[in-house]
Structures are given as C-alpha cells and as structure tokens.
Amino acid sequence: MTMPVNGAHKDADLWSSHDKMLAQPLKDSDVEVYNIIKKESNRQRVGLELFASENFASQAVLEALGSCLNNKYSEGYPGQRYYGGTEFIDELETLCQKRALQAYKLDPQCWGVNVQPYSGSPANFAVYTALVEPHGRIMGLDLPDGGHLTHGFMTGKKKISATSIFFESMPYKVNPDTGYINYDQLEENARLFHPKLIIAGTSCYSRNLDYARLRKIADENGAYLMADMAHISGLVAAGVVPSPFEHCHVVTTTTHKTLRGCRAGMIFYRKGVQSVDPKTGKEILYNLESLINSAVFPGLQGGPHNHAIAGVAVALKQAMTLEFKVYQHQVVANCRALSEALTELGYKIVTGGSDNHLILVDLRSKGTDGGRAEKVLEACSIACNKNTCPGDRSALRPSGLRLGTPALTSRGLLEKDFQKVAHFIHRGIELTLQIQSDTGVRATLKEFKERLAGDKYQGAVQALREKVESFASLFPLPGLPDF
C-alpha cells in the first residue's frame, strides 16, 4: 500500500516510521541530546549552585513548559489575535495577567501587565522603546557597580549594550568606600543630564533600594521611574523586601530567579488617573498601556511563547502560597548566615552584609581575584561567578565573587548548611592562593588554569570536590523526575 504525498507516493513503512519518530521519547529519539541533559542534571544534583540569578523550577512549572502550548502561534493580545484557534490561549494569558497582579497585590484599575516578553532583556528594551525616544536619555546603575548590561552599559571606547547604542546613557555609581549607592551624586548628575527615564534595578547589589528617593529625583527631572526587579521579584511577592510598586511608573522582571518560574519576562505599568489639570480640573490618564503593548508586539516581538506564559502562570500561583513566603524568608536568612560565616573566616563582604538573596565577596584583601577563585571553585563543584567590586580598575580582572542563596534554599538547605558551604568556599579560595603563589601574581588566567589542571593540584581538587558532592547529594533536586 502507498500513500500520495505532494504528488509522490511514499511507502507505508516510511509513514509508520514517521509516526513512530513523533511518539518516541527523547532517550530513544536523540541519545546525544538526552545524554547531555542527563549530565547537566547530574551536575546540578551533585554540585552547589550559588549563582544569584539561578533557581530550580518546580515539576509543575516544567510540565507546563513542555506542554502542547509550544505548538500554538498567537500573534497579538487576548481578543485581538491575528490567528484563529486561540480561545484557550486567550484564557491562559488572561489568567497569567490576573495572577501577576494578584501576586504583587496590585489593583487592576491602577496597574496592568504584559506577560509576553521572552525574557528580562527584551522586557527592558520594550520599555525604553515605548517611553524614551531614539537617543533619549536613560540613567541606570553602572554595570561594574552592580547594575545590569541592559541598563545602558558602555565603556570609554565602546557602547556595549543595545541600550547605550540606541539611547544616551549616563550611569550612576556606588560609593567605592561603602558599596552603597551614592544617591546625592545621582541627584546632582540627573539635574545636569535630564534623563527621560531612571532605572531602579541591580544585578549585584545586596541592599534594598530607596525607591522613594529615586522617585523624588525622577519627578524633579520629569522622568519616568522604572524598576527592574528581576533579581528580587520573588522576595517582593513574599513581602520580604520593599516593593517598588508604590513609587515606580513601570516595573519589569524576569520570572526564573527568585520567582522560581521558567525563563520569561513581565512588564507592569500604571493605569488610570495620572494627575489632574490644575486649570481645568480634568483628569489626565496614563497612556503607558498602549505604548508598552505596541512596543512588545508588533514593535519588538512576534508570537508569544505560550508554553512559557503557562509556566509563569503556574509559578505565580505558587508565589501566592504560605510555603513560598516561608521559602523567601529562608532565602534571606540563609544569605545572612553565609555572609556571617564568610566574615568570620576573614572575608570582606561588600556593604558589610545583605538585605536580600546575594552577597558580593571582595577578594582583594586575600590577594586574589574573582576569575581565579571562580575556576577553582568550579573544579570543586561549587558554581558561582566572578564580579567587579566597587573601585575595580578593570572589568577584565574583577575582584569579587557573587554568591546567591535561592537555588540551594529550594533544595532545602538551612542556615547551618550554609555555614558548611562557607567552609567549602574557604577551602577553595585557600587552594586558589596556593596555586597563585606557585604561578606568580603576574601569571595570566590561562597560565593559572593550566596549573590548576596539572597533576600537582588534582589531588586537592578531587578531595574537596568529593566532599562537596557528597554533601550536595544529601538534598533533593526539584524538577522533572527523569531530568
């Protein structure tokens, strides 16, 4: 028997094979990819994940992410699609929007939300596109001082971020002695620069932001205030840190960090009455909704990732539970325990501690840097990232390590466990200093890595790695059973 396909006849066995291919599980369909995923799953299970920007999504979130929603294309917004067959997609997106407002206790008459951004960076760029004309002026925390690449980073010789390419950016800074944001200098510079938008957001800053002060500065300059709460969105939802919504015009976030969802983004914007005309008494309404929605689609994106929106909706439901609130309090408690333990071991913590989920360890007093420490810790199954510290002269040799507690807290680690984690880190940095003394302080990072991989230090690396992996394996890894 044969079947006609595009004018040709295909053997029935081929179609049978085709149908079998569509029904095969990954482990049978693509062994190479399956094995890579299994290796990564094992790395996460036996290692200590200390990236401040990472977390372990729940099984429910990952199931939604891997659902049939991946198949559906749906350009547009609920009730205004360019494709048919979207009644359930509309239902899903509307539910996600409703939950987003509920999770942050927002009045739907005063706030709206776009849940279509593919991630945090597109969400930020959509806001800039909507509210700041090309070559308009933006102020954000400088990347070496704890800001984010999308907040306008540029060097003296090159515009690095698209934000700095298409808009004019002036960074604000932290005080190099204290590590705290210098709000006085920000206020003074804003009066000279006259930004259209000020960004209240960080990627490596361990203290709460003064949103009231930032709003005052924004108002003095006729600027919008946008919070990028990507790192702290879960903490905000749980009421563990101050909320940006009281003072900001717009709030953006990713959904996979402390919120513990899948990788996506959201943009919250004010609605309703903005002010009242003093002469006419007429209400002036915000127009942010139409500007932001049109910037996301059709301005910068095509069809939304409906499977990701489903994952975000699930995460938002979880974020409204008592269990989630307890988890977020534990994230902060664990971070303080880690900070205190490292301080007792002789390490300098930038700003002297933390109000949130991360700390920045300044290694200059130890005589080493973040790049070398990062490589040694990675070899010992401790995952974290190098980061610039206030006062660093070069981003190519950052002095610090950024450490975060959300992921390991999701695995069930408590304060006493993070004290052990601190000692593992300490042993790794001591090993870093041994290798560095052997190679010399002027050795390149490449030369350092070669010495690290040599026979002389592999015994010490293996011994520490085995202890780390034995400890990490005591705690369950959230997610799908097979991965």
UniProtKB/Swiss-Prot annotation:
It is found in: Cytoplasm. Pathway: One-carbon metabolism; tetrahydrofolate interconversion. Keywords: Cytoplasm, One-carbon metabolism, Pyridoxal phosphate, Transferase. It catalyses: (6R)-5,10-methylene-5,6,7,8-tetrahydrofolate + glycine + H2O = (6S)-5,6,7,8-tetrahydrofolate + L-serine. Transmembrane segments: none annotated. GO terms for biological process: glycine biosynthetic process from serine; glycine metabolic process; L-serine metabolic process; protein homotetramerization; tetrahydrofolate interconversion; tetrahydrofolate metabolic process. The modification N6-(pyridoxal phosphate)lysine is found at residue 257. Its EC number is 2.1.2.1. Its main location: cytoplasm. GO terms for cellular component: cytosol; mitochondrion; nucleus. It comes from the Eukaryota. It is an enzyme of class 2 (transferase). SUPFAM superfamilies: PLP-dependent transferases (SSF53383). Its cofactor is pyridoxal 5'-phosphate. GO terms for molecular function: glycine hydroxymethyltransferase activity; pyridoxal phosphate binding. Interconversion of serine and glycine. In eukaryotes there are two forms of the enzymes: a cytosolic one and a mitochondrial one. Homotetramer. Identified in complex with ABRAXAS2 and the other subunits of the BRISC complex, at least composed of ABRAXAS2, BRCC3/BRCC36, BABAM2 and BABAM1/NBA1. PANTHER family: SERINE HYDROXYMETHYLTRANSFERASE, SERINE HYDROXYMETHYLTRANSFERASE, CYTOSOLIC. Belongs to the SHMT family. This is Serine hydroxymethyltransferase, cytosolic.
